[in-house]
């Protein structure tokens, strides 16, 4: 399947109507951001990753499968990066409205599933809230918010522990992937900033974290002067290629599993509270 040939916005309206009404019709909406990614990576880093990885995943899917993609949402929720020039951010309220309005229209067309294919870590929680609200309003359509880096097999063997734990932004992983996908967009500076290990002046209190079980609501300026959180000096084209293959393999299997399922379950509405 050619990802470029599965663009929902490039269909004429009769084709779009037919696509949306296919059994199990699934739309994938890639989400990125327009935000600083250190002095070496472009503002569109997350949008580019979501777009390129999704197109590559589509190339590994059977052309007969009822799945299409929407244009990438290239401006997202990025308040943590706003002190840095170039960053553009929508409000949380506007993001919720955006997902609700677009998702509601897709549901009314007959779409069975909407996947929010997100590459920006700063809007994971917000898209989960948006998905839950949309699912409640449109119970006939499944809504699946996902983060492209979550649950990917092989990352632990490809990245050192320090980068897995603290390389959150424009560090080794993102710089390597960009070196592989679009090397012309990578600047010469490869900084390291924010040593957030035990004893660091910028480390969260004991038992708390930047992400994970007990996260802090941090701003990039709390942690870094350059916008990099991690060590971009470790980046390489070879690692970027390995990361791309891990991402493609992971999401190809996830989409195949979804498309072969009957999710969301169909069930009758139960009155609550139940009468004894």
Annotate each PLM feature:
Residues 1-113, 121-276:
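Extended, histidine- and acidic-residue-enriched regions that form the cofactor-binding/catalytic faces
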């Amino acid at each position: 399947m050619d990802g470029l040939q599965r663009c929902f916005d490039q269909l004429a309206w009769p084709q779009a109507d037919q696509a949306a009404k296919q059994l199990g019709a699934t739309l994938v909406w890639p989400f990125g951001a327009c935000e600083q990614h250190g002095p070496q990576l472009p503002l569109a880093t997350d949008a580019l990753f979501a777009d390129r990885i999704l197109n590559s995943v589509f190339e590994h899917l059977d052309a007969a499968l009822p799945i299409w993609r929407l244009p990438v949402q290239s401006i997202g929720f990025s308040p943590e990066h706003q002190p840095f020039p170039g960053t553009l951010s929508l409000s949380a309220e506007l993001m919720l409205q955006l997902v609700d309005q677009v998702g509601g229209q897709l549901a009314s067309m007959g779409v069975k599933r909407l996947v929010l294919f997100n590459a920006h870590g700063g809007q994971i929680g917000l898209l989960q809230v948006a998905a839950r609200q949309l699912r409640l309003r449109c119970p006939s359509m499944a809504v699946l918010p996902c983060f492209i880096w979550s649950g990917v097999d092989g990352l632990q063997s490809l990245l050192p522990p320090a980068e897995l734990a603290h390389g959150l932004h424009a560090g080794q992983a993102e710089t390597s992937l960009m070196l592989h996908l679009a090397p012309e967009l990578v600047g010469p500076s490869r900084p390291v900033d924010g040593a957030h290990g035990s004893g660091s002046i910028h480390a969260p209190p004991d038992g708390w974290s930047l992400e994970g079980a007990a996260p802090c609501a941090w701003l990039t300026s709390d942690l870094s002067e350059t916008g990099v959180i991690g060590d971009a000096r470790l980046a390489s084209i070879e690692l970027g290629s390995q990361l791309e293959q891990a991402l493609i393999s992971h999401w190809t299997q996830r989409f195949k599993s979804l498309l072969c399922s009957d999710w969301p379950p169909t069930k009758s509405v139960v009155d609550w509270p139940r009468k004894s």
